């Protein structure tokens, strides 16, 4: 196995390139520990949307590579209460008066480990929220998040470990705004979902679930030309088991991108702007948009709590398969 890890500079910023004969990734720790590039080396296809300049990344950091959302998506008015404490997150979606996508996608993470093993190549990064004063004003907890990226054969494994090193419990959710290149004229998309959340004009769930009107096509592989998406789906895994995954089929390149998530990821947001930008974001979330303000069971919303001293790991993976035709 031709495993490799090297330090590089990416658009003027320190980065780590790692991979094998199948896959190559670039991780930029200072840019929210973003896997900014993922290349299938068999076909030389760039899988993720990359910025052309550092400025373009900083303008819209959640629309390149694999941004880490902690917590993911919107919190109405940036406000919620948990165990007697009221939290006020910054309003960074001013037109809808929401907090959007959490604290970590633009912060500098620390590199913990880079290593090669017989199993694959591993890059670990970590961020301690207690060291970020502007985060502590909003989320006054000693939370630590560690990302472990492993490339083994034709798969990138992403493991997110959330740790409570403080003295008080906190609610948490994590997700990824994974931004894949998606030429709509030659690509299809499938998702293991039968239901989606009804959203209001602020893109917040009303609490009502609806059947996906095109679910058969969604299961089999949809043509997304002329389809605009910013929708929140409940994974069908929650009710009937099976796989919990999104798949992109690049028909021209004869490859499939299989994006799997473990049982903690109960929801998927699918976003493609106006459908004409050449990208698609299948976003696995452990909690649904605005989960902290929904009067619904946590078993449905995905709202989880870490008590002092506890930690948990949420696992996902991206596998590239060749479609021989």
UniProtKB/Swiss-Prot annotation:
Keyword Heme listed: no
Sequence similarity: Belongs to the aldose epimerase family.
Cross-referenced PANTHER family: ALDOSE-1-EPIMERASE, GALACTOSE MUTAROTASE
Signal peptide: none
This protein's name: Aldose 1-epimerase
Induction / repression: By nitrogen or tryptophan starvation.
Lineage: Bacteria, Bacillati, Bacillota, Bacilli, Bacillales
Record flagged with keyword Isomerase: yes
Active site annotation, chain numbering: 177 (proton donor), 283 (proton acceptor)
UniProt organism field: Bacillus subtilis (strain 168)
One GO location term (cellular component): cytoplasm
InterPro entries per UniProt: Aldose_1/G6P_1-epimerase (IPR008183), Gal_mutarotase_sf_dom (IPR011013), GH-type_carb-bd (IPR014718)
Residues engaged in binding substrate: 73-74, 230
Pathway it works in: Carbohydrate metabolism; hexose metabolism
E.C. code: 5.1.3.3
